Curated annotation (Swiss-Prot):
Enzyme class: hydrolase
Family of the protein in this entry: Belongs to the DNA glycosylase MPG family.
GO molecular function: alkylbase DNA N-glycosylase activity; DNA binding
Domain of life, per lineage: Bacteria
Record HAMAP family: 3MGH (MF_00527)
UniProt-recorded name of the protein: Putative 3-methyladenine DNA glycosylase
This enzyme's EC code(s): 3.2.2.-
Gene3D superfamilies: Methylpurine-DNA glycosylase (MPG)
GO biological process annotation, one example: base-excision repair
InterPro entries linked to this entry: Formyl_transferase-like_C_sf (IPR011034), MPG (IPR003180), MPG_sf (IPR036995)
Keywords: DNA damage, DNA repair, Hydrolase
Amino acid sequence: MATPLSPAFFDRDPVKVAREVLGSTLVRVLPGGEVLSGRVVEVEAYDCPRDPACTAGRFHAARTAEMAISPGHWLFWTAHGHPLLQVSCREKGIPASILIRALEPLTGLGSMLTHRPVSRERELTNGPAKLVSALGLKPAEVVGTRVDSPALHLLPPPALLPADAVTVTARIGIKEGRNLPWRFLLRGNPWVSPGVPSMDLAGPLTAKS
């Protein structure tokens, strides 16, 4: 069995982390022992404080302070009243992070549907708030815990995804930093979020290995 990604993995540039987390498996172990899991098919990077998006309303001062903890810990920010799952990056004191935006369900589909009933399965985890709900995550129980904790962790992909398997776009729902290609998704995967990038970046973009 693969070893979960350790906090040390996240102690660096969140853009590089996001690219390498794509294709990993997010594992949630419920209190009763049932395992829910999904393949990470969409990730965004936020490299605060140098990232213009961090000063444009999405991150107020208190929230930014909460993010400035040691790397490799689970965090949440709230958007439109919904908690979104992220992981702290870079050294302690720098509020950089990655945001997990979408999952392709692998195990525990029945429980996910119980947590978040939907008429179309593809709408179960194809968004950052949706996946938090489907996994039954309670921010108060998770925030500040290590990314390799038994209850919630990430298993690395077998290998770094090749460039031709990855699409890179601008991020979704931001007003500043719209020109930064810091959203990574599995090309052609039906579980990616339906959100529209904040800017149509000129020319086709592919991720570099």
